[in-house]
Curated annotation (Swiss-Prot):
GO terms for cellular component: vacuolar membrane. It comes from the Eukaryota. It is a multi-pass membrane protein. It is found in: Vacuole membrane. Glycans are attached at N84, N255. Signal peptide: none annotated. Pfam families: ATG22. It comes from Emericella nidulans (strain FGSC A4 / ATCC 38163 / CBS 112.46 / NRRL 194 / M139) (Aspergillus nidulans). This is Autophagy-related protein 22-1. The chain crosses the membrane at residues 35-55, 109-129, 144-164, 168-188, 270-290, 301-321, 365-385, 399-419, 434-454, 471-493, 507-527, 536-556. GO terms for biological process: amino acid transmembrane export from vacuole; autophagy.
């Protein structure tokens, strides 16, 4: 039997009512890729390019010059005839540094964009925690993903109607859109382990899953011990399935397991497809900006196009992704399922506490999350800082900034598809590939710091003194992002106890997005203090370097072994749910 071109070797035994154990098919994978194609444009084109400079420009049009704090900033986008003014001849005032007053506080217009991002990340972290219970249990995972996509894309489109007089409203729409994007990507990431777990190539493995063929007599009782002890899902189905020896036997001694290979491939394709879509839309946005004479309206118009793209291409994902329901969430006192959202939210916060406590037994997850906390903060902060630096201190126009992003994305596509080849040829473990990306990433802030060296400063170029220097740095940033985006996500998935994907991916996302509260805010503070962005490169260089020793300590084999053992222990404690699921299984 075949479905959408992929052979269906059999069906896994359901663990609870509504459990979707069908093998992953081509249409489901296309649905997963489709949302990356839809939403990655906001990450790359909006957050990575046009949204920060739109917020800065709208605030600038309502601000005053930092030099005298009375002269209004220009009301239109003005760039000198020659944008090649070297940094050493440009004071912050000459570079057009502007400030606005928000709640009586003096805020640099570049800092306004950074603070807006920090606030959105804080709200995003709270939202991600609150929804994780509904993502793990019941059939809400897909519904929430589509809902957040709709809200986020509409808010992005509404920025078109925002004028500089109400620039704070633009910041509000940006906060909502970025919050929804982050929440939707958490839900999308939680599908990845399920797509891998039910992938036909894994189901065909001799030592893999025991399956029930659809042609067999489904009326025969199937005991819960029909699963092999080598099955990574066995701990979810029986309380006394795996011993530590079993888990050690299950884990291959090779550098990369079959599951990690499939997970990395799917993740890399998803990132690559998303970047391809972003490159295409970015090209359209640049043409629109040039044709509309690079005004503030031009920036708002391209943000509308980004939101429209996000909305339209979410539709295939809404149709093709399977809900893949989780087990029902039962109340401890009566064993009945939760019916209200308040119940799900309360459970989610309690679950976060339990998940955080569980990580005490998972040394490698702790090490990875600590490293990822710092690394993801650096990734998010470098992107926004570079764009605002190029606009406010190198006086680059929107079209030029858009071209940098195109180069970055092309490099990202190349990186997403090539890092797996490089790691395979060099026989690198996933953690080693991530470390190589970190070393390459460190070059970006170090290059910016060259501008402080007097000998280089006197040259008038190098050390980010000329606009053209942003382009090669964009290539490096793209290569790094292509590798980190795919490898970190899939590598973390291998360290998660089976059956707890959404909870641990919520922790992953909170670590990722939550850390980004600090980096942009610190850069904003540095910018407010010094009147320019360049000193923030010292902070970024340290921030990117700190994850290295932590990542070096991560042991993938030990992490996977500990995760499987913990899953067994956790399932053994869930006696009520085990009885309910066991009764259901015996009725099959």
């Amino acid at each position: 039997m075949q479905e959408d071109g992929i052979a269906e070797p059999g069906l896994l035994l359901p663990r609870y009512p509504g459990d979707d154990t069908r093998p992953t098919n081509k249409k489901e994978l296309l649905g997963w890729y489709s949302y990356g194609w839809a939403a990655e444009v906001f990450t790359v084109c909006a957050m990575g390019s046009f949204l920060p400079i739109t917020l800065e420009q709208m605030a600038r049009e309502r601000g005053v010059l930092l030099s005298d704090k009375t002269t209004p900033c220009t009301a239109i986008w003005k760039t000198p005839e020659s944008s090649n003014t070297s940094w050493q001849n440009s004071s912050p005032a000459a570079a057009g540094q502007c400030i606005v007053y928000i709640l009586g506080a003096e805020i640099n217009t570049a800092s306004f964009a950074m603070y807006t991002f920090s606030v959105s990340v804080l709200i995003q972290a709270i939202l991600i925690i609150s929804m994780s219970g509904a993502a793990d249990h019941g059939s809400y995972r897909k519904t929430l993903l589509v809902s957040f996509a709709a809200i986020g894309s509409i808010c992005t489109m509404l920025i078109l109607a925002v004028t500089p007089k109400v620039y704070l409203l633009g910041g509000l729409f940006a906060i909502v859109a970025n919050t929804c994007l982050g929440a939707s990507f958490v839900l999308l990431n939680s599908f990845l382990p399920l797509l891998v777990r039910y992938h036909p190539s894994l189901l065909k493995e001799e030592s893999g899953y025991m399956v029930r063929s659809p042609t067999e007599n489904s009326g025969q009782p199937i005991a819960t011990d029909c699963f092999s002890n080598d099955d990574p899902r066995a701990a979810l189905l029986q309380g006394d399935g795996m011993t530590p020896e079993d888990t050690r036997e299950f884990i291959s001694s090779s550098n990369t397991s079959k599951e990690l290979t499939i997970s990395t491939r799917i993740s890399s394709y998803g990132i690559g497809i998303g970047y391809i879509g972003a490159v295409f839309l970015q090209g359209i946005c640049i043409l629109v900006i040039v044709q509309t004479r690079q005004t503030t309206f031009s920036l708002r118009l391209v943000l509308f196009l980004i939101g429209l793209w996000w909305f339209i291409f979410t539709i295939p994902a809404a149709f093709w992704l399977r809900p893949r329901p989780g087990p029902p969430l039962l109340r401890a006192q009566d064993g009945k399922a939760y019916q209200s959202w308040l119940g799900y939210m309360a459970y989610a916060w309690k679950s976060l506490g339990r998940t955080a406590m569980r990580t005490r037994h998972l040394k490698d997850i702790l090490l990875f999350l600590a490293s990822w906390f710092l690394l993801s903060d650096g990734i998010a902060t470098v992107s926004g800082t570079a764009v605002l630096f190029a606009k406010t201190q190198l006086n680059m126009e929107p079209a030029a900034l858009g071209m940098i992003n195109v180069i970055t994305m092309i490099s990202g596509v190349f990186g997403a598809f090539s890092w797996s080849y490089v790691s395979r040829v060099l026989n690198l473990r996933a953690s080693q590939t991530i470390i190589a990306c970190i070393f390459l990433f460190e070059l970006v802030p170090l290059y910016g710091l060259l501008g402080f060296i007097p000998a280089i400063k006197n040259l008038g170029f190098l050390g980010l003194q000329q606009p053209w220097e942003m382009f090669p740095l964009g290539v490096i940033y793209g290569l790094v992002m292509g590798g980190l985006s795919s490898y970190c996500r899939s590598f973390f998935g291998q360290l998660i106890p089976p059956g707890y994907e959404a909870s641990f991916y919520s922790l992953y996302a909170i670590t990722d997005k939550g850390s980004s509260v600090f980096g942009p805010a610190i850069v904003g503070f540095i910018t407010d203090h010094y009147g320019e962005i360049r000193p923030a490169f010292f902070f970024l260089a340290i921030l990117i370097l700190l994850p290295l020793p932590l990542m070096l300590l991560v042991d993938a084999d030990r992490g996977k072994r500990d995760a499987l053992a913990l899953a067994e222990v956790l399932e053994a404690r869930s006696s009520l749910e085990q009885r309910d699921y066991g009764t259901f299984s015996q009725q099959q």
